[in-house]
Amino acid sequence: MKNKIAFVAVGQAGGNIGQLFEDRGFNVLYINTSQEDLDTLEHAKYKYHIPGGEGCNKNRRKAKQLVIDDFDRIAAEIETKIKADLTFVIFASGGGTGSGAGPMLIDLLIDEGRAIGAITIVPGQNESVKAHIILTTVFQS
């Protein structure tokens, strides 16, 4: 089962959840615009830093542009690191990197003919209004 399912963990929240899966033996590729966040994933086997940003600070548009600018390298990372029958993309829908890059990466993987699932982390009741607005835009796109 662990060879048939893999994960692409996007952003800080996605990375935190991805670690739980990697700790249980699943293959996980961590993608983030923040090198600092990637550095907290001490035992991660595969990490990719999207250049040009040190986090997106709830700026979904910035994350989307960084993915567009680095699209070929991100696609190559996924192609070489993620070999599975089913790939889940994990991302927060109320942040910056995850909410901007997560849906784009799902589209990339679907275009490659992969079977995809999404694990979307929604903002809690105590999170900012901005996080809830971002959530709405993620599900509208």
Regions found by a protein language model. Give the residues of each.
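Tubulin/FtsZ superfamily GTPase core signature
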Residues: 1-141
